[in-house]
Amino acid sequence: MDFSYSSYEKLISLLKQYNYSITDYNNYKKYEKSVILRHDIDFSIKDSYKFSLFEESLGIKSNYFVLLSTGFYNPMEKRVRKILRDMHNRGFTIGLHFDTTAYDNTDLNKPIQSEKHILEEILEAPVNLIAFHRPAPTVLANNLKFPGLINVYSKEFFHDCKYCSDSRFFWRDNPYELITSQKYDRLQILTHAFCWAESDRCPAHVYKSFISQASWERYKYLTENIRNPEEFISEEEARKLWLNK
């Protein structure tokens, strides 16, 4: 299975063909066979927003998890807030993607509740889901519970459901085969919109393009925040930096 939109569309078609109901973490038990589609926003809000529009064109809704402590995007930025609210208003579920390594304290509940509150302020809506970012084995083993939040790495969703992920452009289980095998009535499929595009791409190229794009985005933000930026750097110079020329 590659990382093209057409491959994802085939995934959705197979799920429907084999009678899986596409649902969420609150309602999956209502169905004889159910699948939860999850997306962790590790790198790019834009890619995730584009992917949500693609999913909407397929007639489905899924679950997106926002990483507040990332250095790659700012959930508080006006444009990002607008995107997240739009996704929520269009029926996509937004949850908290929490990085345990961002905090020194062993009691995680306080920073988790703080980030939950921030995300609720951004969305202007309640948040009741948490997915850990690159969870340590101890986090997975302890079946952690937090007030007001469903831990999607709890035993209920990580062991009782068949879990499948595309982490680092690599499927540890082929999702097509999981579906067609008919061995599992409960699936949780994690994908990262950053990996997906209209056509399949070399992972190294994706990461290099992502790094290169950052220089152009910095220039655009610069033009919005200082007067006469061309006194220091022209658009042509910025474009050359972006294109690595």
Q: Where does each model-flagged region fall?
A:
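Short HxH-centered metal-ligating active-site micro-motif
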Residues: T93
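Terminal accessory/targeting
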Residues: M1-N63, L67-R79, R85-R90, T101, ...
